[in-house]
C-alpha cells in the first residue's frame, strides 16, 4: 500500500486536488514582495533612494477597523473569503496592490510578512491581510442562491493580528519605543492558492 501524501492541495481555480510527498512542495521558489510608493506591490525591490520612504495613518481606538462589513455576533461561514473593500476604503488602512498578473501565480507554503513600523505610543495592534483582487470584468457568482458581484472583489486569503508588545514573546511583553522603527514579523500560515491571470 503506498504511503499517504504529506499534503494534499485543493486548487479551487480548477476544482482539482494535487498530492505532495513533501511540504512545502519541492521546487517551490521563495519570492519576496515589496511595498512601493503610491500603494504599489511588486516582486522588484525598491530603489535605494526610497529606502527611507514610509506611509502613515492615524489609528483611532474608538473607531477600530471591523473584521466584517456586516454587523454580527459570530464570524459566520463566509468571513474567510469576505469582500475586503469595506476595509480598503478606510483612511486608517494601507493598501498595496500589484499590477494585474500577466500569468498565473500559485502560492504553496508558509507566508511571512516582515514590517518595519513605528508608532507615537508604546503599543499598537497591527493587522496584515493577503487578498486576491478580481478583475473588473470577473463574472458574477451565485453561492447559495445569493448573487455576488465579483468585478473588483477583494477575496480574503489570510489575515493575522498582532499586538506590538507581544512581537517577541507572549510571556514577556515588551512596549514599543515611541517613534522608533521596529521590525515586526507576521506568520500568515501556510497557503495553497492560485492567483489567476488578470488578478492582483
Task: Tell me the role of every PLM-derived stretch.
Residues 1-200:
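C-terminal, loop-rich substrate-recognition/catalytic regions characterized by aromatic stacking residues
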